Amino acid sequence: MKSTQPRLTRRDFCFTSALAALVPAAMAGKAMAQTQAQAVEARPITGGPKHHFFGYYEKCPWDASGRLHLALEVPFIDRQPRADDAAIVGLIDTAEGNRFQPLDETLAWCWQQGTMLRWMPGAEDRLITYNKREGEDFYSVVRDVRSGQVRRLPRPLYAVSPDGKYALTLNFSRLARTRPGYGYEGGRDPWAADKRPAEDGIFRVDLATGDARLILSLDRAAGLRPKDSMKDAEHWFNHIQINTDGSRFAVLHRWRPPGARSWETRTLTAGPDGSDAFILADDGYWSHYDWLDRERILAHAAAGSIRAYHLFTDRTDRAEAIGAGVLTTDGHCSFPPDRRWVLTDTYPDKERKRTLILWRWPGGPRVDIGRFFAPPALDGPTRCDLHPRWSRDGKKVSIDSAHEGMRQIYVLDVEKIVAG
């Protein structure tokens, strides 16, 4: 969610393979940890002349077999998509020479989160879903990649429950205006002039029937323990994520005070029908996060005046500092299915390298498995974050990267590391 200054000038890629100096660290009062550098080959599964990427870090791009990997294909990477720019939705067949199989095209996509492309829970062997636009209206489709059969849903989707029964979504047009790089262009926003609409916010979509209803409005969110900075501010939601059993969700509630250069953030949680809304964090900063289980969230966020990784417990004021001295910067953090490791990354350092990190949960060694050059020309909304994603068996990692001059997808085999 952070950005750096750009200019695409060269190709560069660097792995480090020597053992790094031990970095002493206390992890929330637990045992000392260390940082190691252990090179893992980043193998491209896409190539030119077109660019390819998947999108965000909280979804698994592989099918149930681990053979097919979802991807978007685009002809450019150096500007924001316009309303008439289509991305090709497709599959990468890793058992057939990484052949890209186009399935459809979409006008509803962005650089940071793609088109919310994912395999449907419970049908990861054949069903995918993604967002589209017709005229000024966004919607989503569920596609059977075997038969080609397509079912249309009346709203775009943001997050899907673990059982595949419902989804949560928001206003992608509002998001495009308030947070470029995360929403979609070309859509209609009936509430554009309303700074905290009572009829817009988070909608729940029944994935069997397509029925959708508003469960948490922006007006209601703004009325929860309001702050002085909210007066006359424009409000929006971003980064919805449902917990591991579908019983709660988290969302970032953001607002920009009039005349302010940046926004403020707090994190809300609620039941899947919008009930029992709770302010989980209200210290102004919350970035990337993942649910550890049905109650706890790992996030790079502020707890008091400290910005660091914290483990928050839902519906409490508990926030435990995590990875002190080891996980030192914001990154796109996620857990594998067995919850034994944390996968994360960094933003570009002084050498414009992004580091890809595995960290043994909770408090074991940090292993830096790769460093990837970030082309200066790709910055702000067009930047290419690694957005690392786990395979379903927790043995591979997929990333988007432009370290070789094009935006492509790479896979790293981490089985030997995570087996330790």
Predicted segments, located by residue:
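N-terminal secretory signal peptides and thylakoid transit peptides that target proteins
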Residues: K2-A21
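Surface-exposed loop and turn segments in beta-propeller and other repeat-based domains
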Residues: I45-H51, L103-C110, R213-K231, I369-G380
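Blade-loop segments of beta-propeller domains
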Residues: Y56, A86-L127
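Blade-terminus and WD-like Trp-Asp/Gly-His loop motifs, strongest in beta-propeller folds
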Residues: C60-L68, T115-L127, A159-Y166, Q241-R248, ...
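Short, conserved, GDST-rich strand-edge loop motifs in beta-rich repeat architectures
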Residues: L72-D85, F172-A198, H253-W263, Y347-P348
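Conserved blade-ending motifs and adjacent loop-strand segments that build the rim/top face
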Residues: G323-H332, R366-H387
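Loop/turn-rich, solvent-exposed surfaces of beta-rich toroidal or solenoidal domains
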Residues: G325-W361
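Asp-box/WD-like beta-propeller blade repeats and closely related beta-sheet repeat scaffolds
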Residues: M116, N131-G201, L218-P226
